[in-house]
Amino acid sequence: MNKNNVLRGLLVLAGLSLSSLALAHGDVTPQAVDTKGLEPLGKEWRDTNPYRKPYAKHDLAVEIGASAYNQNCARCHGLEAKSGGIAPDLRLLETGAEGDEWFKERVINGAVRDGAVYMPKMADFISQEGLWAIRSYLESVHVDE
């Protein structure tokens, strides 16, 4: 009987540990993005990613974008942009202007279906600079299907 109680206790502990890992991807509340060092873009949205190569500070944009992605996007879209099936795998997003168009539309308008919010309007919380830095990061981890 004592062994059964110990086993049950270990199973509960293991379950709690695993559930905390599931929540460790990111915070639900959007986090500020420090874009120091990137060209300020102003209020009007660009149609294409201004931080794409040959932008001189492209590598800095990718670094900022990786951090911002992990803080704001990974909870739903997965660590390193590898989706676990909850939300689209952003590594598969088209590169270049076509992918920029979809990205811009989604971060500005979010995703709502039948009144349920599947993705918040991230542009309400994160600057254009921060979001284009995230886009730069996503292009750096792009994979073909």
Swiss-Prot record:
Q: What is its main location?
A: periplasm
Per the entry, induction is: Induced by growth on ethanol.
Q: Which PROSITE patterns match?
A: CYTC
Xref: InterPro entries: c550_proteobact, Cyt_c-like_dom, Cyt_c-like_dom_sf, Cytochrome_c550/c551-like
Q: What's the domain of life for this entry?
A: Bacteria
UniProt KW Iron keyword: yes
List the GO terms this entry assigns under cellular component, sorted alphabetically. Answer: periplasmic space
Q: How is it modified after translation?
A: Binds 1 heme group per subunit.
The pathway to which it is assigned is: Alcohol metabolism; ethanol degradation; acetate from ethanol
Signal sequence, start to end:
1-24
The yes or no answer to whether the keyword Heme is present is: yes
GO MF, any single term: heme binding
Q: Which UniProt keywords apply?
A: Electron transport, Heme, Iron, Metal-binding, Periplasm, Signal, Transport
Q: Which residues form the Cytochrome c domain?
A: 60-142
**What does gene deletion cause?**
Cells lacking this gene are completely unable to grow on ethanol as the sole carbon source.
- Which Pfam families does the entry link to? Cytochrome_CBB3
Q: Where is it localised?
A: Periplasm
* UniProt-annotated binding residues for heme c: 73, 76-77, 119
Tell me, how does this one assemble? Monomer. Interacts with the quinoprotein ethanol dehydrogenase (QEDH) ExaA.
Q: What does this protein do?
A: Is an essential component of the ethanol oxidation system that allows P.aeruginosa to grow on ethanol as the sole carbon and energy source. Is the direct electron acceptor of the quinoprotein ethanol dehydrogenase (QEDH).
The name this protein carries in UniProt is Cytochrome c550
Species in which this protein is naturally found: Pseudomonas aeruginosa (strain ATCC 15692 / DSM 22644 / CIP 104116 / JCM 14847 / LMG 12228 / 1C / PRS 101 / PAO1)
